[in-house]
């Protein structure tokens, strides 16, 4: 039996939870500028499947790549790493 291929796992912040069973996660990464060598921050939003609607806006979550679940959803929620602090 062959081993399952490695899936991408990202940690990001939930920026929207208005959709049913779907969250929008903002993932920030750093890349080195090719000429000047300075670290530049890049951000990208991913839609992820949240089966039980447990993630809320501001939470830090871990998402994993999965089969296409809709036209835009390619990730699913693995765990809520840190709950948002409500002031």
Curated annotation (Swiss-Prot):
GO terms for biological process: translation. The keyword RNA-binding applies. It comes from the Bacteria. GO terms for cellular component: cytosolic small ribosomal subunit. Keywords: Ribonucleoprotein, Ribosomal protein, RNA-binding, rRNA-binding. Gene3D superfamilies: Nucleic acid-binding proteins (2.40.50.140). Belongs to the universal ribosomal protein uS17 family. Part of the 30S ribosomal subunit. Pfam families: Ribosomal_S17. One of the primary rRNA binding proteins, it binds specifically to the 5'-end of 16S ribosomal RNA. InterPro entries: NA-bd_OB-fold, Ribosomal_uS17, Ribosomal_uS17_bact/chlr, Ribosomal_uS17_CS. GO terms for molecular function: rRNA binding; structural constituent of ribosome. NCBIfam families: PRK05610.1, uS17_bact. This is Small ribosomal subunit protein uS17. CDD domains: Ribosomal_uS17 (cd00364).
């Amino acid at each position: 039996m062959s081993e399952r291929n490695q899936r991408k796992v990202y940690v990001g912040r939930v920026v929207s939870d208005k959709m049913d069973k779907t969250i929008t996660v903002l993932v920030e990464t750093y890349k080195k500028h090719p000429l000047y060598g300075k670290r530049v921050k890049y951000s990208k939003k991913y839609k992820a499947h949240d089966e039980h609607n447990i993630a809320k806006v501001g939470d830090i979550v871990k998402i994993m790549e999965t089969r296409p679940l809709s036209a835009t959803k390619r990730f699913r929620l693995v765990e809520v790493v840190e709950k948002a602090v409500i002031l």
